[in-house]
Amino acid sequence: MPLVTSEKMLLDAKKDGYAVGAFNVENMEMVKAVIAAAEELNAPVMLQTTPSTVKYGTLETFAGIVKAEAAKTKIPVCLHLDHGNSFELAVQAMKAGYTSVMIDGSHEDFENNIAVTKKVVDVANAFGIPVEAELGKVGGKEDDLEADADTNTDPQEAKEFVERTGVSSLAVAIGTAHGFYVGTPVLDKPRVSAIKEVVDVPLVLHGASGLSEEDVRECVERGMCKVNFATELRVAYTDAVKKLLEEKPETFDPKKLGVVAMEAVKEQVIARIKMCGCDGKAK
């Protein structure tokens, strides 16, 4: 089926108490693996690319690959720009065929974050495309965006931010970090409930790679409607390729490397879709 926007997908999740898995993809193999996993579980799914991935492969290339693979399936597939770092990139993604975009102004102060987000929302409304924004700082490193320390999202600021920008979804900081965790993360899960009480748009959890199933499920129960996974998919992909080359160093066919990588990513995505509770929720 054609690509769909994230709006109905996330509103359905909010209404029915589950989250949509959103998976960062780096190449054709990862695109095929994520969609195959979602199709097997009859789950809605979001595929995401970051600015560095877009620089590597271009917006148009990824849009073309995802559109072609989505056309073969009956499940809802959305293509999302993750951590869009400028107004210009967000607009370029819309023009290239992305059906959802994020503008990340969380490194700005509150007023400037509102200003850049509102600017993107105004254009996105003309395209009929939903916008995700971020308030508070998620730790770790995502491409060239780095937080020196976690600053969790304030519920009242979140309420004002959503009202003034008109965003369709909001990524909130509760103690997660991008990349894998060195120690055990301490998540402020009650904060999710507090934000949900005053914000009426779907909430997004970034930095879910490496979180326990218990943590993810509780965050979803408290109101997270979209959960992002990136690092663990990269690791699954790379480890599978390394393993094949260690066992069969004579291998030189990229397709053989791609097959084992796709299987590893698919297995990881299946587990995460079930963790989010969106298996069987394709509409």
Feature annotation, model-predicted:
Residues 4-12, 16, 27-52, 59-74, ...:
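Alpha/beta enzyme core
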Residues 19-21, 77-78:
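Short active-site oxyanion
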Residues 20-27, 52-55, 258:
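Short, N-terminal intrinsically disordered low-complexity segments that are rich in Pro/Gly
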Residues 25, 79-85, 201-213:
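Glycine-rich beta-to-alpha transition loops that act as phosphate-gripper elements at the mouths
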Residues 243-283:
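Extended, intrinsically disordered, low-complexity segments
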